[in-house]
Amino acid sequence: MVHSEFPLERLAQLASNPFQIGFARQVMRMLDPSHLIAYEAAQDGLLMRAQNEEALARPVALLREVYGDDLVLLPPQVRYMSLGNRPYEPIMLLRVRIAPRHREAVLGEFAERDVQLLEEHERPSVCVLRAEAPLRKLLGYGEALAKLTDGTGLHWIWLDRYIPMSDPPGGQAAEGKQAPSCGD
């Protein structure tokens, strides 16, 4: 399945099971369907494809609860699309709601991640920022925001579009490799 609306994927495996596809099929019966995430039983395990990292949180928590230390979770990976021989990357829109006292710290984090600020609204009690960035620059942003705001900041991330990449992920053009795509 392509699922180009899901630019993020994460693989779950069971350390004690030599047949990962069986584990994946079993898990798929436990997980609730959602418009934010798709599941696929693959030879390597359960492939979870999602709109963002937050969509992965609930199924990951359930899997950890059920399987404990036997669960192996690979880090989330950005899903690049390929059109012809050219890789395209997902561009995400980001909305952040914070207390004004955290504004400078959050804008500093934006600068470190090369996040482009699109709009800013500040009132005495709340500051709302709208921005965009490649998904690869936003991985782990929720945790970073929580640290910057003592857990009070809110954020929403969603897919806006795919754009051609001038520098393929992992320097794959130089190595003669094709970027992983949403069609894989």
Go through each PLM region and give its residues.
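Accessory interaction regions appended to the cores of large information-processing enzymes
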Residues: 1-184
